[in-house]
Amino acid sequence: MSNLYSAGTPHIQELQNILDSQQEEWAAIKENYTTQNSLIAKENCTLKMKLSELENKVSQLIRENVQLRSQVSLNKLEFQNKLASQINVLENGVIQRLEEVLYMFDSIRKKESLPSRPTSTNETVDRIKKRRQSNEEARNRRRSRSVSTGSAHSTSSMKRRSSTFGEDLIDASIKRALDNAQSNSLQTSDTLRLSELPGLNEIDTNNVNNDNLLSPIPHKKRKSNRRKSIYVPELPKPNNEPLMENTIEQQENICSESLIQEGEQSEKLGENLDADQSHVEDQSFSFTNSVLEYSIPEENTLPKQDILDETEKRDTAVNQKKKLEIFHDPPVEELSSSKNEKPPENSITNDPAFITVTGNNKVKHSMKSRKPKKNKGSVDESMPCTQSTESVDFDRPRRTRGKTVDYRLPSLRAKMRRPTEKLVDATTTVNIQDLQVKYKKSKKVLEKELKTDMKAMKSPKKNEKTFESGTIFKKISRDNESRPSSTHSTSSVDAECSHNNSHSENINSSINDTTHSSFNNSTKSVLSDITNISKNKQQQKTKKLLKTAIINDIYDDKTKNAQKTVSFRVNEDDLSVFDLIQHNDTNKSSPKTYRSRSRKNKA
């Protein structure tokens, strides 16, 4: 027994080891499955929550739908009630007016002693009401028949079609049938009323009915309808055939025939639609396919060549219709022959006489002869463009007026900003003489000052003071170079007065008064030597920029002292720092023009 036990122990140990290892694997697999189960449970919970939310939303939508339907139905009922009441009011009003009209006719007959009508007004009104009731009954019958035919047609076609599309088609066919039936019934009722009214026995009711039935649908107004006003419409010729009284049975026969025809047409339409849907089994009929065919060219089933051919044909037709000969229209026969015989496409393109009129080159409707365009020698450069715009063909506007653009040369803006084509650097100089502002007195002002001085000389009281002070002839002494400026003798004054007598003769009396008054007032003043200032001073004119140099003189033209003591320049070109030497009044502005020079030389 001991040998068996000793021999069996290692096998048991191996089995135990295998069991331990498998147990670990089982534990790992268990953990994985538990985690997966927990995740799945969480996802199920979230899905349940979402489903509950969706159910709540669906229930809310259903409630809203029910409310909206109830509102729509109530609105429809209200609208129908309003319509019915309004129509009843209108009908009663029309009947009342008819009664009034008939009463007027009867009263006129009585006044004029004419034979009265065989039937009274009340009887006519009763007849109209009976006709109304019979027409309503006929309409109800037609509606019931049309509904029955529509239901039979819908049961046969609903098997192959979608529910919404079939219902819409049935409703449309029923509406058409009802509209036609109503129009027919109205026409027949109109003919009956015309037949019963007195004085209208000459008109044929059958012709009226046929004209109404066979009348075309009113077409849309176009521009060509203006020409129709040229032709006067002919009046309808009355036929001499006997009258045919339409009864209610004839009305019903006509309406039943129209209903049968419309039922056949609707059945044919349904069969055609069924056949179309048998070809397209899986594709649902929708409006998007038709929209895609027209709007998106990639989704279109037609090949591109067919589309291009169609567009070319349209363009050629439009070009053929355009009128080139403006002042000469061909006769009607030629137009009809040209319409019947279409010219080939090659003849239009190859014919040199045929001018293709584009949007840019329009035919000008004027009597003036067009001048031939001059071919300019210089060719304009093309505008820079990208690769996408190179394929587009259209005439670009000219950038310049026939001049080629050379981008190497400086632009006009650069020329305006700098004085020359050279670069501007720090070595450039500015001429200060160009910035001079010089105050030059005009000849008229100088003459006026001389005249005032001469008047002051004539007055006896002021002569002594003027001789003593010597302030009257300051400006005269500046102009005269040879005469000294410091001392004035009586002889020099007399000479100047005799020289300027010619100027003093033209002075007005007003100036004399002003000068006398000024001198009388100036006797009391302390500064008697500078009181000889005229009151009527001219306004200073605007300063002008002159090109002569600025002389830094203390005693320039505006100074009132007679003598120049210091001057800062010997010559105008010299620097002002070294102008410390006194110089004579020989440096004057030279005359600029030939005329002024000649005058100076003569003087």
Swiss-Prot record:
It comes from the Eukaryota. Residues 146-157, 201-214, 483-512 have a biased composition (Low complexity). Residues 583-593 have a biased composition (Polar residues). Residues 218-227, 362-376, 594-603 have a biased composition (Basic residues). Keywords: Cell cycle, Cell division, Centromere, Chromosome, Chromosome partition, Coiled coil, Nucleus. Pfam families: Shugoshin_C (PF07557), Shugoshin_N (PF07558). GO terms for biological process: cell division; centromere complex assembly; establishment of protein localization to chromosome; kinetochore organization; maintenance of meiotic sister chromatid cohesion; meiotic sister chromatid segregation; meiotic sister chromatid separation; mitotic sister chromatid segregation. It is found in: Nucleus; Chromosome, Centromere. Residues 11-74, 304-325, 431-451 form a coiled coil. Residues 112-164, 201-227, 331-399, 455-519, 583-603 are annotated as: Disordered. Residues 455-467 have a biased composition (Basic and acidic residues). InterPro entries: Shugoshin_C (IPR011515), Shugoshin_N (IPR011516). One of its GO terms (cellular component) is kinetochore. Plays a central role in chromosome cohesion during cell division by preventing premature dissociation of cohesin complex from centromeres after prophase, when most of cohesin complex dissociates from chromosomes arms. Belongs to the shugoshin family. This is Shugoshin. The gene is SGO1.
